[in-house]
Design a protein with these regions (language model features):
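Alpha-helical membrane-protein topology signature
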Residues: 2-235
Length: 235
């Protein structure tokens, strides 16, 4: 639990009665989002650690560049949300474990780093520069979230052209975490109360996980690409 989640936990009144209110249920969903995020990363991390990568095709290994990009973007989002007091267990778990997976990727991963991923890091740096210049976290957070939604493109294309590289269980858990995170947005039913600090991260993560879930569970199984089509996607 982080930021307002801790405040709500220690400041709750009525215990079980409070948890039965809409605000209490939203708090529960935010906690569930963090737990599901942890489970998803655990599944993914276990695959990375337990696989004998010396026997696997090189292009199936985790990418150092990819995980550096995810770690940089998500830690930036976490820092900005901490500064605004809106960080949740979901983004805290995601940012922290992405750094750990990046460190593991340094050991077993490939050196690939796509143009899109480099662009995402640049967008994130622009966001940091805007914060330093303007003294406002909103532009920086928006840039980091835009970079996050764009950062899934290389992973999506790779899985579309070469199915089987992504773990379905992990992505299913990530998607469930995102759904809980969106339900837990403070003031969800009152759009006038939405802020960049509360809304941008859950929606950005949902776009990322939703696109991958659609690919893994619908597009690839029901509409597989031919060899020529895969080659065109890879190109």
């Amino acid at each position: 639990m982080t930021s307002y989640e801790l405040q709500e936990f220690f400041g709750m009144k009525g215990g079980v009665e409070w948890l039965q209110t809409w605000e209490g249920m939203q708090w529960s969903f935010r906690i569930a989002a963090g737990l599901l995020m942890f489970c998803a990363h655990t599944v993914y991390g276990k695959v990375i650690l337990m696989t004998d990568w010396s026997k696997e095709p090189k292009d199936s290994r985790p990418s150092k560049g990819t995980w550096f990009t995810w770690a940089a973007m998500d830690m930036t989002i976490l820092v900005f949300m901490l500064m605004e007091g809106t960080a949740t267990s979901m983004v805290a778990v995601d940012g922290t474990i992405n750094v750990i997976i990046f460190l593991i990727a340094l050991w077993v991963g490939t050196n690939s780093w796509t143009v899109v991923e480099k662009g995402c890091v640049c967008i994130t740096l622009v966001g940091i520069a805007l914060y330093v210049t303007l003294g406002n976290t909103a532009p920086g957070l928006l840039c980091a979230c835009v970079a996050t939604t764009s950062g899934v493109i290389p992973t999506w294309l790779k899985e579309r052209s070469t199915p089987g590289g992504e773990d379905k269980t992990a992505w299913m858990l990530w998607m469930a975490s995102c759904v809980c995170g969106v339900i837990g947005i403070p003031g969800l039913l009152e759009p006038s109360k939405w802020t960049v600090a509360n809304v941008a991260q859950p929606l950005a993560f949902t776009i990322v996980c939703g696109s991958m879930t659609l690919l893994l569970f619908i597009l690839n199984p029901l509409f597989p690409l031919s060899r020529d089509e895969r080659a065109s996607v890879e190109g």
